[in-house]
Amino acid sequence: MPWSTLLAEEKQKPYFQQLWQRVEQARQETVVYPPKEDVFNALKLTDPENIKVVILGQDPYHGPGQAHGLSFSVPEGVKFPPSLRNMFKAIAIDYPDTVLPQHGDLTSWAEQGVLLLNTVLTVEQGNAHSHASWGWETFTDTVISKVSDATDHVVFLLWGSHAQKKIPLIDGNKHCILTAPHPSPLSAHRGFFDANHFRKTNDYLQQHGRQPIRWV
């Protein structure tokens, strides 16, 4: 079932209509990231029936040219944000012979079935969490619940306390939930690097007859 069907009812709800109007109004008055056409990139690039992994972020990067609708990802040519750099360090720990990419665009992950979902989908330039209370989490909670209900054998990578608050939305009997500290430099040393989440994800997928993710 496509997103258009799964989320049609949600997008008609008053809260979502008001949320979208508020974002549109903000675009008239300030710079909002990501660009309008990229807000739903995570959903555009990863159909529900293809989802193997969900990586939850918080809200988009708030610097120029960084956010393009995929959690943790930046377009090619943009400097690696620290959390993303630490994610690739963790991949290198899990797969020591890996040659890491020179860019931080995770579109190839999305195309393989990794839903790179921020819980808040827009932000004002230079003002982290500025749209956090606008209603986005009601929408993305629904996305998480729909993924849990409509799929089987998906790995949910929940890094940091914000992402881990979403555990009640996920059916742990038919999915794999992996938790670790956030890859931010503030917390990564507390257990992110030795969580081995990238290898564990692929081990789980293969155990359930699914193609592993090519992380690089």
Curated annotation (Swiss-Prot):
Entry keyword Chaperone: no
Keywords, comma-separated and alphabetical: Cytoplasm, DNA damage, DNA repair, Hydrolase
Location in or out of the cell: Cytoplasm
A molecular function (GO) term: uracil DNA N-glycosylase activity
Pfam families from the UniProt entry: UDG
Domain of life assignment: Bacteria
Residues of the active site: D59
Family: Belongs to the uracil-DNA glycosylase (UDG) superfamily. UNG family.
Function: Excises uracil residues from the DNA which can arise as a result of misincorporation of dUMP residues by DNA polymerase or due to deamination of cytosine.
Annotated protein name in UniProt: Uracil-DNA glycosylase
Organism: Idiomarina loihiensis (strain ATCC BAA-735 / DSM 15497 / L2-TR)
